[in-house]
From Swiss-Prot:
Involved in chemotaxis. Part of a chemotaxis signal transduction system that modulates chemotaxis in response to various stimuli. Catalyzes the demethylation of specific methylglutamate residues introduced into the chemoreceptors (methyl-accepting chemotaxis proteins or MCP) by CheR. Also mediates the irreversible deamidation of specific glutamine residues to glutamic acid. Its main location: cytoplasm. The gene is cheB1. This is Protein-glutamate methylesterase/protein-glutamine glutaminase 1. GO terms for biological process: chemotaxis. It is found in: Cytoplasm. Phosphorylated by CheA. Phosphorylation of the N-terminal regulatory domain activates the methylesterase activity. Residues 147-336 form the CheB-type methylesterase domain. InterPro entries: CheB-like (IPR008248), CheB_C (IPR035909), CheY-like_superfamily (IPR011006), Sig_transdc_resp-reg_Me-estase (IPR000673), Sig_transdc_resp-reg_receiver (IPR001789). The keyword Transcription regulation does not apply. The active site is at 159, 186, 279. It comes from Pseudomonas fluorescens (strain Pf0-1).
């Protein structure tokens, strides 16, 4: 994989070079010391992946991510020495299309290969995404269920560009929205709690991490909060599970959407937002096959038109809408 490094700290650049050296297939094609230089170099020689720092002179990593995704799009992973201190910048960069975030590998002390493992694992997953691997087979649709209980659920999946898209969508809903909401965003569990707090502050809604064994409830927005998959069980409660182990991203949107299609006893809407790859497309199609309304974000409003495009390609979405039109549509479907 052709990889670029954007970082103004020589020690951090060296740490990344050493980590990448453990995988001979990775090649560092260029290094930039600030965001402006990265924008220029990316236009001249677009890599497969950029390892982007956040705090740099001239232009920071957030603005560089925005510019690159608009002008010379490619996969971007935020690499920082202090994720917790930079949590809001991380979400902003992810809103512009960054795929993931990881700590800068340490130099000195301990096992260097072990220190490099988290970064190399994320790069491996992204390699699968940008390689557009064939979609995995899915279980056959379950038999239609009675919806006499009339419980209401909105199942939302998002990835690159998701934090900003979720902020817009949730701001368009009232605090006492009549449907339960469950969010599956591709984000490391280290950041899940911070993301829930950020979305709650931005939207004014009750956004929190989903807890094992609790049912989705109207008025609550539950965010998948671990690196395991979240799924709906037959009894209507939520559970975290390591299976299936072959899913590239954890938590998987497909896994959750499929569980909703199979086990939700009520009315539901599936919403697939911006993101790279195709996670969520097959699950959304299964929801549609079960008679649920399904919505995909349109290309123009998507930071990364990957997952919604995959859904549109297999006719998984009943409706394709601009981001700003999705919340009003949900209010039409589930009025007070």
């Amino acid at each position: 994989m052709k990889i670029a490094i954007v970082n103004d700290m020589p020690l951090a650049v060296e740490a990344l070079r050493r980590a990448l050296a453990f995988e001979p297939a990775h090649q560092v094609v260029w290094v930039a010391s600030n965001g402006a230089e990265a924008v220029r170099l990316c236009a001249e020689n677009t890599p497969d992946l950029i390892l982007m720092d956040l705090i740099m002179p001239v232009m920071d990593g957030v603005e560089a991510t925005r510019r690159i995704m608009a002008e010379s799009p490619c996969a971007i992973v935020i690499v920082t020495v202090d994720r917790q201190q930079n949590v809001h910048r991380v979400f902003e960069a992810m809103g512009h299309g960054a795929l993931d975030v990881v700590d800068t590998p340490a130099i000195g002390g301990g096992n260097p290969q072990e220190a490099a493992a988290p970064l190399l694992r994320k790069i491996l997953n992204i390699g699968w995404l940008i390689g557009e691997k064939t979609a995995r087979s899915r279980p056959a649709p379950a038999a239609p269920r009675s919806t006499a209980s009339r419980q209401r659920l909105v199942a939302i999946g998002s990835s690159a560009g998701g934090p900003a898209a979720l902020e817009v969508l949730l701001k368009g809903l009232p605090r006492h929205f009549s449907a339960a909401i469950v969010l599956v965003q591709h984000v490391d569990q280290v950041f899940a709690a911070g993301m829930a707090e950020w979305l709650a502050s931005a939207s004014g809604l009750d956004v929190r991490l989903a807890r094992e064994g609790e049912p989705p409830q109207a008025g609550a927005v539950l965010l998948a909060g671990t690196n395991h998959h979240i799924r709906l069980l037959k009894n209507g409660t939520l559970a975290y599970t390591a299976e299936p182990v072959n899913e590239i991203y954890r938590p998987s949107i497909d896994v959750f959407f499929e569980s909703v299609a199979n086990y939700w006893n009520g009315d539901a809407v599936g919403v697939l937002l911006t993101g790279m790859g195709r996670d969520g497309a097959q699950g959304l199609k299964l929801m549609r096959q079960q008679g649920y309304l399904t919505i995909a974000q349109d290309q123009q409003s998507s930071a990364v038109y990957g997952m919604p495009k995959a859904a549109a390609a297999i006719d998984a979405a009943v409706e394709i809408r601009p981001l700003e039109k999705i919340a009003p549509r949900l209010l039409e479907i589930f009025p007070k």
